[in-house]
Amino acid sequence: MRSDLTAFLMMQYKNNQSVLVVIYTKDTNRVLMLQRQDDPDFWQSVTGTIESDETPKKTAIRELWEEVRLDISENSTALFDCNESIEFEIFPHFRYKYAPNITHCKEHWFLCEVEKEFIPVLSEHLDFCWVSAKKAVEMTKSQNNAEAIKKYLFNLRR
C-alpha cells in the first residue's frame, strides 16, 4: 500500500527532465519569445516536461504544438536536436511543481527553424514577440535559455 501511495504522489509532480526549443526564422533570424502566465515578467522559448513514455524529441514536437500550435513531423528537418543538455537549478518559486528535495532539472536543447514569422496560437502564455537573438537574451530570466540562444544563434549566417 505504501508503494502505491508513493507512486501516486510522484505522478502528481513534474519530471525533472525537460526540453527547451528555440524557434527562429529563416528569413529574419529573429527569435520567438513567450510571456509566461504564472510569471508575467518571465519571457522564454518553448519549454516542457518530458513525459515518462517520451523521448526528448517527441516532447519537443508535442510542446511546439501545445504552446504555439506549430505542427512539426517526426522527420522534419526544421527541428534540430542540439545533442546538448544542461542541468540547472529550478527557480525557488517553481519548485512546488516538483517532488520534495528536487532542486535541479536536466534540460535538452533543440532549435526549430521556420520559414517566416507567424502568429502563434497561445494556450499557455500571455503574449509573444519576435525579436533579435540579442534582445531575446536580454529578455529572458532563464540563464540556460540565454546560453542556448547565444551558442546557436548569435553567429548564424545565411
Curated annotation (Swiss-Prot):
Residues 14-153 form the Nudix hydrolase domain. It catalyses: 7,8-dihydroneopterin 3'-triphosphate + H2O = 7,8-dihydroneopterin 3'-phosphate + diphosphate + H(+). Its EC number is 3.6.1.67. Mg(2+) binds at residues 63, 67, 124. One of its GO terms (biological process) is folic acid biosynthetic process. InterPro entries: DHNTPase, NUDIX_hydrolase-like_dom_sf, NUDIX_hydrolase_CS, NUDIX_hydrolase_dom. Its cofactor is Mg(2+). It comes from the Bacteria. Keywords: Folate biosynthesis, Hydrolase, Magnesium, Metal-binding. Binds 1 Mg(2+) ion per subunit. Catalyzes the hydrolysis of dihydroneopterin triphosphate to dihydroneopterin monophosphate and pyrophosphate. Required for efficient folate biosynthesis. Can also hydrolyze nucleoside triphosphates with a preference for dATP. PANTHER family: ADP-RIBOSE PYROPHOSPHATASE, DIHYDRONEOPTERIN TRIPHOSPHATE DIPHOSPHATASE. This is Dihydroneopterin triphosphate diphosphatase. It comes from Haemophilus influenzae (strain ATCC 51907 / DSM 11121 / KW20 / Rd). The lineage of its organism: Bacteria, Pseudomonadati, Pseudomonadota, Gammaproteobacteria, Pasteurellales. The gene is nudB.
